[in-house]
A protein has these predicted regions:
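Conserved DHp (HisKA) dimerization/phosphotransfer helix of two-component histidine kinases, i.e.
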Residues: 1-66
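Conserved micro-motifs of the catalytic ATP-binding
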Residues: 40-43, 80-83, 153
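Conserved catalytic submotifs in the C-terminal HATPase_c
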Residues: 70-80
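ATP-lid-like helix-loop hinge signature
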Residues: 100-124
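Acidic ATP/Mg2+-coordinating residue in the GHKL
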Residues: 133
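Short conserved segment of the HATPase_c
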Residues: 138-149
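Conserved glycine-/histidine-rich ATP-lid loop and adjacent helix of the Bergerat-fold HATPase_c
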Residues: 164-174
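Glycine-rich ATP-binding loops of the HATPase_c
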Residues: 173-181
């Protein structure tokens, strides 16, 4: 209608259509996350944490390799847990993906500095997995609302990844996701019960 009335140039129309297409992709992504959240298998099983995380990194190998991001592990042992493995992997996928994006943005011309460190520790009846990156970090202002619906630090982000990561941890694992340190390094930590009650 606006094009017919001469109110939009070809360039403006193309820009408007591209924005509309981006909005559709964002909506589709949001729907997919909702679908996965509510349809995730919730089978409690015994597994080794280190093996589970290394399997996840193997699945992410192509994505991380293309971004020239390397991953280091520390503190891991043969700790076994009775938990919902795929939920833990979903949460870590979000945290690692965010760390990767931060490193790519922070070190555009210095790929050798793109390192993610995943640290493990256990205390009493809980496990803690920290995802560390040395990117630009999270501002103090954003730190206060980082887990709020539709808040994002990324240009192309949808602001729902960390929201769902925290929600999954709290509702499915009797755990939590916290921003432990907001810069140099940025540290997000997942905690969950070693022995989840059915």
């Amino acid at each position: 209608m606006l094009k017919k009335e001469g109110k939009l140039s070809d360039e403006e129309l193309i820009n408007l259509l591209e924005k509309g297409q981006s909005s559709v992709k964002l909506l589709s992504s949001t729907i997919e996350i909702f679908r996965n959240f509510y349809k995730s298998a919730e089978n409690v099983s015994e597994f080794e944490v280190q093996t589970s995380i290394k399997n996840l990194i193997t699945l992410m190998h192509t994505e991380l390799s293309r971004a020239n991001v390397s991953v280091k592990f520390s503190g891991f042992n043969e700790q076994k847990v009775r938990q919902i493995e795929n939920i833990i992997q979903q949460i870590l996928l979000i945290l690692i993906h965010n760390a990767k994006d931060s490193l790519v943005e922070s070190y555009k011309d210095e790929p050798l500095k793109r390192i993610i460190e995943i640290k493990f520790r256990s205390f009493e009846d809980k496990c803690y997995i920290g995802v560390y990156d040395n990117g630009n970090g999270v501002s103090e202002q954003m730190s206060e609302k980082i887990f709020t619906w539709l808040n994002t630090t990324k240009k192309q982000g949808n602001g729902i990844g960390l929201y769902f990561a925290k929600k999954l941890a709290q509702e499915k694992l009797n755990g939590d996701v916290r921003l432990v340190n907001n810069a140099k390094p940025t540290v997000f930590e997942l905690s969950f019960d070693i022995n989840l009650k059915d």
